[in-house]
């Protein structure tokens, strides 16, 4: 069909194919909003995600990358995480205007899409400098400009920093599980179980916390969130105001304390290198600190740990590597929250490993 005719009473309107150009807008403005709000959001207009809508957005973006960029699910997942990191870094870049955005016009044409990619790539350079433990200096966003513009348009209206941590955690851990869990019988502890365990243990601010089978880092994030709530109450009592009324200096001091805690008091081990990276990302996404997340088989006796792992652990704790040699010399942690990797699909039958444990000894 090359055209259409509409009639109302005595008036007629003819429309030929190609006569009208349609603009694909990023979103629908709110009742009291404008197109500017959906094209270049301000910090005050960012929305908190609720229920499962963040999970839906993450899945939609991941599927878009998988289909349009031709990436398998795992590479597509890590490309999505690069963009999510850019979104978080941009939100933290106070008081500068937000740069993580695409206008509807940019998204609809190749030149605009290239402009978006250049803008987001500039943010990613800051991400790499800030998180050198996660990204290499030569890493880059590999998405096509068209795909990147679409992903940005889906994420730009949300505040990932202010969204409830349980909503972020559920969205992150489900998409990690779908892409990194593999076929080794791995499973991730339900969030309500993690919260119950952490509340029972009640970790304190200056206690070293370890998850020796950290998976995606859910236990570590839950424990640190518990401690941050205590820290917020302490700061509010000292300042005399709730967090929403703190000045810039107080917020910076609070965030610096959180980063210091993550760097010195939170440790995670996992045998899967991809999950080690995913845990670091989870820690940064929720608490602005990647912690000390190391790859190792924590079931092995300490004297069988690799020299590289022992060196990194010793440096993080602040001891000499020679001190990390057996069970009697590694009591450096105050709290251990973990779900050990024992199960019907991943049986551990090595007597050298099992004889270390009273309940697993055969």
Residue ranges and their predicted role:
Residues 1-16:
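Nucleic-acid nuclease catalytic cores
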Residues 15-49:
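Non-catalytic C-terminal interaction segments of nucleic acid-processing enzymes
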Residues 52-71, 151-153:
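Short amphipathic alpha-helical segments and their helix-coil junctions
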Residues 60, 64-65, 167-192, 198-200:
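Class I SAM-dependent transferase core
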Residues 66-80, 161-166:
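Structural motif
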Residues 81, 85-177:
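Long recognition/docking surfaces used for binding and targeting
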Residues 187-320, 327-331, 335, 343:
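Conserved S-adenosyl-L-methionine
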